[in-house]
């Protein structure tokens, strides 16, 4: 291949190699063709043999330092600040220029030869390939060519081998243990050539260069750094302030340009390396003219530059991670066993680690993964891309905002928190598929989500104490740039890599010269909602058996992942009770509200969610039991209260006959006149306790009938309970059945006079206290007219009836003649002993003397020189007035009403059935307390 056609590549091509600190220098002069030297390097067979030999030996013996790739001391980083490869800027130019930089045609043939594919170890191609999932999937949609037509062959070779070829071609032994490995992974956007216009079928695309003026400036800086490398050869490199200043100056000059190229991004990477940022992931947006018009979101791609001085002289790879061969298992050294145990734990505790804890973890875990590539099992590789790409995307989102000065696409640098979370959670299903590929069991995929959530919730206390203990060691070692979320996600991914490498010990590593990297056809998937609490997926919230297993996980937080997976599978197989599901659903709704409330402020800690969701089923179960108990108690209490009320209403007035207490019974009330009277019934059954006075109409009952009814009531005994409750239907005590709490009644025999007896509650309202049976209800009629007329009519009618009945009975029983009550009676005079006629009988409603004064009425039925009897009627709230009896003696009987009687100076409240008398020479006064008439019978003894 003629080198004259590639003269414009000589400067930029040499800068594509990241030369290590101990690499031999190439003293080039102006006009000297560097491609000739590179061509000789690629054609040297002995060097290729050594290259393959050292690569095979170095893999199993190399100690992988996982965390050293993330955290290096500033001194180590400054030591390697000079021998950086000068960045390559890609630009769309001619289609005839090949994208793969080839020193010679022999190199091109060696790239495609399968034999050489198996002799060079491409350890960092597949695992470090970090394409953006969204960008690659959308780029596959908008691309116009097939997958086979757009393969990118990027076989750069080891720059140290190429550089050493000039000084000593025959040297075969290259030290592999004296150098340290440091990986720089950064994400860049390759300006894709529009395949629809400028790429022919099955073409190899080329790296083109623009901004030659900037590259010349960089070349001058590089030559100065080469001269410094000569002076410091054989010694350990130290930080060079002048080199750093030159790199910063060159970076700032490039950033003044309107658009950023790959070289600009690489200089930023060099600068950040000297500022103790060991892994730099940068997102560079390509110029708009270098991409198809439809690929507005498909611009970004990722480059991984891996400097490794561990196995042989520095191997530097610039890879374009597209769809490539599958990822095989990574090897691990036996010295990692203690670190791997902590690595397993760190994947569950990633959600609540502080940034300083992350820095401590990066220093404490030091195995370095050696990732190999194998052209089989493409599905696992795609998932590994998602795994690594998710880490790079998280870190890039913060680095882009801090360092990227490109303003062409500001919308990408201002993503919302919700979009970042979606990108973060995108790789979670892919991580589970990695575990499926390693164990060859597809069923484990469903259990990983369960296992992650379960073990995070169960081990959080123990792990938080351990992490806080480690925080004291590394308080000052914090990531320089990046938010808490991106650092947390990065720590999670690195712990995933450790766990993945522990499962793949003692695996053979194939050798390849180049890696055929094609476009990835991964489908963009929605982020996994692991943070959403689901009752059916997370057994911690819904399965009652998990509560029994939680102490086991708290006590055995260092168990292996397999045991946890098995336990999670067993938990998933168990059935969930229906009541627990309902309870868990209620708890999950609370947790979801809690998450929504906290969503604007950031990510909610999983320990809070787990505490809420774990305690809520227990609390809800206890609440259900307590609620049922309270319900049962309330029902029983209510029924017992009803019974007590009924018994109180029944038992309080029901006193023995000897006690003399009386209870009130309802009598007939006059709605028109509002006049009332009472009747005396002792031990007459349940009655209203709060109702002292029962309304009644004007008295239409004569004295004899009232006394007769009272006598009948005295003869009746206490009404049994079944007489009171035979109509009541109390609430049933059914724990699991929803029944009414009302006190129901069977149909009442209203035609017999059955009525409901209501009792007033202290809080207001009424409560059914029982049913008034016909035995307790008075059958007295209500008076509708004047008391005189009513009494006359009713009494006359009753007298006639009674007389007829008497006559009938007497005629049947006795055969004697009867006297006329209206006629005087023949009696013997005591003094003269002669027979005289006297009025001894006074029929009803007949009187000898009548006095009316307002509402006060006095009827004298019998009046003799020695005594007189009669009836005193007081109107509603009427007072008789204070009166002196003189020499007479007055005897009173309260026929109906409630009275305030004052005997000389002592007041008394007397009611129906009471009697009192006033001795001679004293005063008395009577006042009606009711709103109806009160009736008293009196007897005056004359002296």
From Swiss-Prot:
Residues 633-672 have a biased composition (Polar residues). Residues 412-426, 570-583 have a biased composition (Basic residues). Residues 890-943 are annotated as: MIF2 homology domain III. Keywords: Cell cycle, Cell division, Centromere, Chromosome, DNA-binding, Isopeptide bond, Kinetochore, Mitosis, Nucleus, Phosphoprotein, Ubl conjugation. CDD domains: cupin_CENP-C_C (cd06993). Its main location: nucleus. Residues 224-239, 438-463, 488-510, 706-715 have a biased composition (Basic and acidic residues). The modification Phosphoserine is found at residues 73, 96, 146, 189, 225, 261, 316, 333, 376, 397, 439, 528, 538, 684, 709-710, 763, 773. It is found in: Nucleus; Chromosome, Centromere, Kinetochore; Chromosome, Centromere. A motif (Nuclear localization signal) lies at residues 259-273, 484-499, 558-574, 780-798. There is a cross-link at residues 45, 119, 134, 180, 212, 217, 238, 260, 271, 273, 297, 440, 534, 677, 727, 807 (Glycyl lysine isopeptide (Lys-Gly) (interchain with G-Cter in SUMO2)). Residues 70-91, 224-250, 358-377, 403-513, 537-587, 632-717 are annotated as: Disordered. Pfam families: CENP-C_C, CENP-C_mid, CENP_C_N. InterPro entries: CENP-C/Mif2/cnp3 (IPR028386), CENP-C_mid (IPR028931), CENP-C_N_dom (IPR028052), Mif2/CENP-C_cupin (IPR025974), RmlC-like_jellyroll (IPR014710), RmlC_Cupin_sf (IPR011051). GO terms for molecular function: centromeric DNA binding; DNA binding; identical protein binding. Oligomer. Component of the CENPA-NAC complex, at least composed of CENPA, CENPC, CENPH, CENPM, CENPN, CENPT and CENPU. The CENPA-NAC complex interacts with the CENPA-CAD complex, composed of CENPI, CENPK, CENPL, CENPO, CENPP, CENPQ, CENPR and CENPS. Binds to DAXX. Interacts with DNMT3B. Interacts directly with CENPA. Identified in a centromere complex containing histones H2A, H2B and H4, and at least CENPA, CENPB, CENPC, CENPT, CENPN, HJURP, SUPT16H, SSRP1 and RSF1. Interacts with MEIKIN. PANTHER family: CENTROMERE PROTEIN C. The MIF2 homology domain II targets centromeres and binds the alpha satellite DNA in vivo. The MIF2 homology domain III can induce CENPC dimerization/oligomerization. Component of the CENPA-NAC (nucleosome-associated) complex, a complex that plays a central role in assembly of kinetochore proteins, mitotic progression and chromosome segregation. The CENPA-NAC complex recruits the CENPA-CAD (nucleosome distal) complex and may be involved in incorporation of newly synthesized CENPA into centromeres. CENPC recruits DNA methylation and DNMT3B to both centromeric and pericentromeric satellite repeats and regulates the histone code in these regions. This is Centromere protein C.
